């Protein structure tokens, strides 16, 4: 069995929870019939141990074991801080 940790990059859209945040992951998908590229967004709940992220920050996250009912991702690093 290989230990492959999935990492993604996204933008923080909510940080109101204690030690948690919601990250939006944007991807483009080609429409199966018309061929137009469409933006699709996935919202993931992420564990933030030190509460270091704010709304608008670009972060890198990694998949981990389930930490709660909705959280199975953890923060790796803050790529870019948001300009307030």
Curated annotation (Swiss-Prot):
User: What domain of life does the native source organism fall in?
Assistant: Bacteria
**Any matching Pfam family:** Ribosomal_S17
Example GO CC term: the record gives: cytosolic small ribosomal subunit
Tell me yes or no: is Methyltransferase among this UniProt entry's keywords: no
Extract one GO BP annotation from the record: translation
Among the GO molecular function terms of this UniProt record, one is: rRNA binding
Give the residues annotated as coiled coil: none
Query: Any keyword DNA repair?
Result: no
Ordered alphabetically, the record's keywords are: Ribonucleoprotein, Ribosomal protein, RNA-binding, rRNA-binding
Q: Share what the entry says about its subunit structure, partners included.
A: Part of the 30S ribosomal subunit.
The record's function comment reads: One of the primary rRNA binding proteins, it binds specifically to the 5'-end of 16S ribosomal RNA.
Q: Which NCBIfam families did the record assign?
A: PRK05610.1, uS17_bact
The protein here is known as Small ribosomal subunit protein uS17
Species source reads Serratia proteamaculans (strain 568)
């Amino acid at each position: 069995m290989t230990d492959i940790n999935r990492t993604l990059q996204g933008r923080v859209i909510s940080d109101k929870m204690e030690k948690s945040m919601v990250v939006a992951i944007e991807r483009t998908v080609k429409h199966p019939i018309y061929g137009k590229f469409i933006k699709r967004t996935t919202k993931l709940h992420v564990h933030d141990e030190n509460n270091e992220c704010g709304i608008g920050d670009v972060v890198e996250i990694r998949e981990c074991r389930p930490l709660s009912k909705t959280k199975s991702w953890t923060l790796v690093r803050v790529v870019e801080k948001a300009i307030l």
